[in-house]
């Protein structure tokens, strides 16, 4: 056990810190892009509705692993897209990290969009009609009346999406991002006789990340619940 901890201990917190950074950056990007997709999805412009619907349905039904691999092999290795300076000594590490974040954003934003759309469906259509009767256009109505209520109603599904994103960050290891699951794999290879102990350590680590998140968002949902 002491040998295991001597190998694992110094790397454990840095690996989970990478997981946390992946989650935070991806969540921010997914919220922004997901909001854009939602706006397009409910837009009166047919082409925008068609494009957003096609994107959401396509990406939601594509395995996340393929999306991340596409960002790495398709965008970087085939098209030459880089998200870090080549002159940097940490180019490969930074580039793989940012490509993973991009993949998570592209994928998770579709679930954010659907969560927000479910929130929009809870807003009585009469409010939009009343806004239009007062001369407000789609943009003003959506921004000032519909969207704020939709966010409040969608906190629980958005929270579930965030928790799923935290667990999905383990897929970043397929392109060499040094997050928690990559460390777990390396540790198991070096300490196969401690398999269940290693699993337990990393399971507890992810529970520490996700349980407070779920409880906090549940409390927030109760406080901000839309009163019927």
Curated annotation (Swiss-Prot):
The chain crosses the membrane at residues 16-36, 64-84, 100-120, 145-165, 195-215. Gene3D superfamilies: MetI-like (1.10.3720.10). The keyword Repeat does not apply. Keywords: Amino-acid transport, Cell membrane, Membrane, Transmembrane, Transmembrane helix, Transport. GO terms for molecular function: transmembrane transporter activity. PROSITE patterns: ABC_TM1. GO terms for cellular component: ATP-binding cassette (ABC) transporter complex. Residues 16-217 form the ABC transmembrane type-1 domain. It is a multi-pass membrane protein. One of its GO terms (biological process) is amino acid transport. Pfam families: BPD_transp_1. It is found in: Cell membrane. Disruption phenotype: Deletion of the gluABCD cluster almost abolishes glutamate uptake activity. Part of the ABC transporter complex GluABCD involved in glutamate uptake. Probably responsible for the translocation of the substrate across the membrane. Belongs to the binding-protein-dependent transport system permease family. HisMQ subfamily. The complex is composed of two ATP-binding proteins (GluA), two transmembrane proteins (GluC and GluD) and a solute-binding protein (GluB). This is Glutamate transport system permease protein GluC. It comes from Corynebacterium glutamicum (strain ATCC 13032 / DSM 20300 / JCM 1318 / BCRC 11384 / CCUG 27702 / LMG 3730 / NBRC 12168 / NCIMB 10025 / NRRL B-2784 / 534). The gene is gluC.
């Amino acid at each position: 056990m002491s040998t295991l901890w001597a190998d694992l201990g110094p790397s454990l917190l840095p690996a989970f810190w990478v997981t946390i950074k992946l989650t935070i950056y991806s969540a921010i990007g997914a919220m922004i892009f997901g909001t854009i997709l939602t706006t397009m999805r409910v837009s009166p412009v047919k082409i925008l509705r068609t494009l957003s619907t096609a994107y959401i349905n396509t990406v939601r039904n594509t395995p996340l692993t393929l999306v991340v691999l596409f960002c790495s092999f398709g965008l970087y290795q085939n098209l030459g897209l880089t998200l870090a300076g080549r002159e940097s000594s940490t180019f490969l590490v930074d580039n793989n990290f940012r490509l993973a974040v991009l993949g998570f954003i592209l994928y998770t934003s579709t679930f954010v969009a659907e969560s927000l759309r479910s929130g929009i469906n809870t807003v009585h259509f009469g409010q939009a009609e009343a806004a239009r009767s007062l001369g407000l256009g789609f943009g003003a109505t959506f921004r000032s009346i519909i969207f704020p209520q939709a966010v409040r109603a969608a906190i629980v599904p958005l929270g579930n999406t965030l928790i799923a994103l935290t667990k999905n960050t383990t897929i970043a290891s397929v392109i060499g991002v040094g997050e928690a699951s990559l460390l777990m794999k390396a540790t198991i290879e070096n300490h196969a006789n401690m398999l269940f102990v290693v699993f337990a350590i990393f399971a507890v680590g992810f529970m520490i990340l996700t349980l407070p998140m779920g409880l906090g968002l549940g409390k927030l949902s109760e406080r901000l619940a839309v009163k019927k």
